[in-house]
Amino acid sequence: MIYDFLKEKKFGYTTGSCVVAGAYCGIYYLKHSVKLNIVELENSKNDKLIIPIEDVKLGKIATIKNINNTGKIKPNRATTIVKKFSGEDIDITNGIDIVVDVELLKMEKDKPKIEIVGGNGVGIVTKDGLQIKKGEYAINPKPREMIKNNIINLLDDDERAIIKITIPKGEELAKKTLNPKLGIIGGISILGTTGIVRPMSNEAYKESLAPQIDVALANNYKKLIFTPGNIGTKYAKIKYGVDDDNIVEVSNFWSFMLDKAVEKGVKDILIFGHSGKIIKLAGGIYDTHSKVADARNEILTAYSSPFINDKQILKNILYSNTTEEIVKILEKENILHEVFNLIAERVVERVSSRWEGIKFSCVIIDMKGDILGSHIYS
């Protein structure tokens, strides 16, 4: 399939594709003295990606490659800028500049044919368990492979290339991603499996969550704490004194992340978090985004019914505006913990029947971190 990003508005291209295009353009300029305004790339599925180039110029500190047959000095360094385009996908990297410096050198023994390094704005891995080794730049394997496959034919047999990636806004943007939690510091990651960003698929985001499990296992944690997000993380650390690496934030994607847990051999999970998200699991809802399914009031009404005979109170629960409002009703009836203990028990029953081989426990908290209910595996 051909993706022409001069015309394409729905799909976008990844940070990895930006680097490939920038590297190709820079080397082509050095070899042929021609400034390309588009680059045609190929991904691992043999799709064609046509990516626009923002700018290309000789490197600021162009060293001397050689004196060619015409007697002219030939520079060996170029800088290319490619603007990231995310199509219709919601992506914080949309529109940022990816700067790629290329340097051509004579092939040397024990030197790689193509060397790929990071610069300012590209994160550095500081924890074990990820696809990239600790201490290296967070440039994932697939983009590395795509870079090499697309530029190898531009190089002479006696020639090697150094590709350096800089992202001017990378360090600032990284604070809005999972990178700090994963131990990737100083910038964003260079990502992309196919090089194409697909709109609103959530696939890229879900895949970015999964490495948290790898980090936890690499640190030899046996019991992992799965939580929807910041509230759960905050209070898990306070209540249990655990490190960030022991906590896995699943966002809304419980089914995906529990599948990954089984795949990676996790044996013990504590489901911990705010009632508004966790109670959905008791209803068999494993994508907890409100646009997918809600049913919080219906679930709370159902699990309150064994303890309440008054139909009007049950109706008040059903038509409450927030979970917090329902909590107040249950407190007034002196059945708060009974209801949430029952919900926690049902959460454990449901996930245990679907994801066999994992010991589950569940703790449900309110916005202040107080425990509403729990069911601990024994």
Curated annotation (Swiss-Prot):
- Keywords attached to this entry: Cobalamin biosynthesis, Methyltransferase, S-adenosyl-L-methionine, Transferase
Gene Ontology molecular function: any one:
cobalt-precorrin-5B C1-methyltransferase activity
Please give the family membership noted in the entry: Belongs to the CbiD family.
Native species: Methanococcus aeolicus (strain ATCC BAA-1280 / DSM 17508 / OCM 812 / Nankai-3)
From the UniProt record, give one GO term of the biological process aspect.
anaerobic cobalamin biosynthetic process
Protein name according to UniProt: Cobalt-precorrin-5B C(1)-methyltransferase
Q: What gene name does this entry carry?
A: cbiD
- EC annotation from Swiss-Prot or TrEMBL: 2.1.1.195
Which class of enzymes does this protein belong to? transferase
* Key word Disulfide bond present: no
Q: Which residues form the signal peptide?
A: none
**Which reaction is catalysed here?**
Co-precorrin-5B + S-adenosyl-L-methionine = Co-precorrin-6A + S-adenosyl-L-homocysteine
Specify whether Glycoprotein is a keyword of the entry: no
